[in-house]
């Protein structure tokens, strides 16, 4: 049986990256929440 997690850097960035987050209102809300919480890493692009 094939496993569900097949790592791919490009897909990861396109789906969860900073620019992807900035594209939508809800994505910007996510970034705002993470900034408010003081997260060191806002998105997967910050690795």
Swiss-Prot record:
GO CC terms, sorted: ribonucleoprotein complex; ribosome
Record's keyword annotation contains Iron: no
PROSITE patterns: RIBOSOMAL_L34
Keywords from the UniProt entry: Ribonucleoprotein, Ribosomal protein
Keyword Transferase part of the UniProt annotation: no
Gene Ontology terms for molecular function: structural constituent of ribosome
PANTHER family: LARGE RIBOSOMAL SUBUNIT PROTEIN BL34M (PTHR14503:SF4), MITOCHONDRIAL RIBOSOMAL PROTEIN 34 FAMILY MEMBER (PTHR14503)
Protein name: Large ribosomal subunit protein bL34
Source organism (scientific name): Deinococcus deserti (strain DSM 17065 / CIP 109153 / LMG 22923 / VCD115)
């Amino acid at each position: 049986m094939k496993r569900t997690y097949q790592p791919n850097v490009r897909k990861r960035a396109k789906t969860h990256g900073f620019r992807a987050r900035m594209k939508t209102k809800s994505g910007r809300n996510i970034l705002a929440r993470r900034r408010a919480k003081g997260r060191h890493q806002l998105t997967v692009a910050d690795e």
